[in-house]
């Protein structure tokens, strides 16, 4: 594992979160491997980062012992950093009235309804006729489905990224600890790959490179 990846990972973490432990690690590694300020800013050319990078060389406390390997939690940390201060929302569909309440999962011709009021059920029966669609009492998988949310203000990142969501009010996309735990599950590798591949900007590009280094893939 290249020591530069370890430096760039911890520096990215410091630049995003101002984590002091990461600053100490970067400072110690740079002193040990004679990495200069100019070396670091070549990876972070945006001027907004430069005053923070200078702190690496002003830091007095250095680590006496350093691991030259990524920790077991590195993948989780990468996902956390990639989604740090993630801010997205879903615009409401004005075809859905404010009076509708409930959750509907539609996959193929199967429909699962939860916590729906009479207005939503009436709407569904008009739009999705029982002659064509099957209304099921069993849960329908959210992944790859159409999700209708009515009367909710938040939805998980996992639901947002794996389904097509329509809502009757503005819905914020929430990244929770549970969501990150689900994302690092090996069965969701493709979702992670898409997440890192879509990232733009200096830090996201670095995180993408380290993601492929940690998971053994090849950076596109």
Curated annotation (Swiss-Prot):
It comes from the Viruses. Keywords: Early protein, Elongation factor, Protein biosynthesis. InterPro entries: Chordopox_G2 (IPR008446). Pfam families: Chordopox_G2. Interacts with H5 and A18. Might be part of a transcription complex composed at least of OPG087, OPG145, and OPG110. Belongs to the orthopoxvirus OPG087 family. Involved in postreplicative transcription elongation on intermediate and late genes. This is Late transcription elongation factor OPG087.
């Amino acid at each position: 594992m290249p020591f530069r990846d370890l430096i760039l990972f911890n520096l990215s973490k410091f630049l995003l979160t101002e984590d002091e432990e990461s600053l100490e690690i970067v400072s110690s590694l740079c002193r040990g491997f004679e990495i200069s300020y100019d070396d670091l800013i070549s990876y972070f050319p945006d001027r907004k980062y430069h005053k923070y990078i200078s702190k690496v060389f002003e830091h007095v406390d250095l680590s006496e012992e350093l691991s030259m390997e990524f920790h077991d939690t590195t993948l989780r940390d990468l996902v956390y950093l990639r989604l740090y201060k993630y801010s997205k929302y879903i615009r409401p569909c004005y075809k859905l009235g404010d009076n509708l309440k409930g959750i509907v999962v539609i996959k193929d011709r199967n429909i699962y309804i939860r916590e729906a009021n009479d207005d939503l059920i009436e709407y569904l029966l008009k739009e999705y006729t029982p002659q064509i669609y099957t209304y099921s009492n069993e849960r329908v998988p959210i992944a790859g489905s159409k999700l209708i949310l009515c009367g909710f203000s938040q939805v998980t990142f996992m639901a947002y990224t794996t389904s097509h969501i329509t809502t009757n009010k503005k819905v914020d996309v929430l990244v929770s600890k549970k969501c990150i735990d689900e994302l690092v599950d090996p069965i969701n590798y493709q979702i992670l790959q898409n997440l890192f591949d879509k990232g733009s900007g200096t830090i996201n590009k670095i995180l993408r490179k380290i993601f492929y280094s940690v998971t053994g893939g090849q950076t596109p």
